[in-house]
């Protein structure tokens, strides 16, 4: 069978830049799945994406399906013929349904019996008949949260579709997808090259688009040009470009012909906090800031234009003219905000609602203040500074700068607090209260910052759960992130804090505002649930995490030690045997209805194996007492692992459920004591080797 390259390009109005890569990759994987289902063999798929097109090029695509034989099994021979050997109605109906006679059927012989069999030869369809439908199916499955309609039809897609091109080699594949008829017309760049041109063969793509249309369809190639150009441009002005990948991706998705240029802004704007300037450059204008070797912002920025100009200076001056008013606004807000100390803005927080049932942001501030002071006392941080930071934590929300540039909340609070003469610990906490903001983000650097950060997050968790709004699908209050943030701070800073205590303290701050009587248990369960995902990402197996969760430990730092200890235990040779023994003991004890003594009666030990185990268990309990007191769970489990042989010998040679009630109870007591030592770490019965 012959092979040819296949091209599909969908020309659209401007696609959402932040979704472009996702759409292109999904289109590629969807189409590959459709080809597999259709049994159309190919060598590979390359995707292309620009602001105004999605395209795929399938290399070495078979021009048709291979012929195949489909086996259709009929009734059993015993049911297909009567005693005289004549076909039954069942056999005749089956044959008729397949367009044959019973006599034309084959026989399928297996160990389980014999059946009528029809081997139907299926002629493969040419690719030309299939490709349009496969492409439509792939596009229909794209992840589009908000499709739109256009014109007078009911067709929906992420943006209006203008052109469609489908070529199998040099052959045009006809079809209509999303309201566009397949044609050889390709659209070029809006301002350069040919506005439209004809493509004759799929092999010409994407080179013809670049040559005639001045469009670089290869997404990764555009990204590479932007990265290399920005790095070079920054070096030329003695700096280093801030090439955050998320912004680079967005800029790549905004241009079809990237040209990297460097511009400047007035040096006096550097008196404004860097974060506000960067927010304006990156967030509003999609510019790349430039820093010197010490990490200080310099009055330069790098931007990417979508056109190759004979006079780039005009484009540079245009961008400088655009950014100047935004930087001037930031400068004005900064100067104006500093005329009033942060603390004077506290009354304004009474006008801002945090959540209707939970009150104002001022109410939240009061709760954070008390809880932060309490936490600071527990972790040995400065209580006075923690309370002061809690009091000022949300005041910057009332400043002009944060109102205009919302992403600067926290960091502007820090700058304003420093200007007001607040203690450095207090100022820093206003910035670090939001840490960690995402997975892998830095943690608060001081005890005061950590206390305020935890207080803020715990207050939100308890409040929202307390009014019955636990997250299900959506998470508008970012409770999952808040829970993980608290856990990370406690674990990674090794604070001896108990969630039960913290959550109870937080709940008390709400007075009678909360309506959910189970709020404390629900918040703890929710937070413990975050552990599973976190520790799986860290490489711990699910069974290890569940073994620890079974005990519902509420001290996160202690939880961390247990997980690491059980992970280590799981790697030992004795783990499988002792996990099975724990499971067996658990099942045996579950069937016993009654109370067990607190100690083994040595006079009732008859078998050598039980005497040996009893002696080992008694000695082990004494050995482990100081080990558990230190919280050294890894050492405890390593010690317990040495009991593998006496435990195995006990189960091999001793009947636990003896007829003699006293013997049975005594043996159960010994096993209970042994299991309790393991349960001081985790439920080892859940560990799977």
Swiss-Prot record:
Q: Which family, according to the similarity comment?
A: Belongs to the class-II aminoacyl-tRNA synthetase family.
| Chief place of localization | cytoplasm
Q: Which reactions are catalysed by this chain? A: tRNA(Gly) + glycine + ATP = glycyl-tRNA(Gly) + AMP + diphosphate
Key word Protein biosynthesis present? yes
Quaternary structure, per UniProt, is: Tetramer of two alpha and two beta subunits.
Q: What keywords are annotated for this sequence in UniProt?
A: Aminoacyl-tRNA synthetase, ATP-binding, Cytoplasm, Ligase, Nucleotide-binding, Protein biosynthesis
Q: Which EC class heads this enzyme's classification? A: ligase
> InterPro entries given for it?
DALR_anticod-bd (IPR008909), Gly-tRNA-synth_bsu (IPR015944), Gly-tRNA-synth_heterodimer (IPR006194)
Any one GO BP annotation for this protein:
glycyl-tRNA aminoacylation
Official protein name in the record: Glycine--tRNA ligase beta subunit
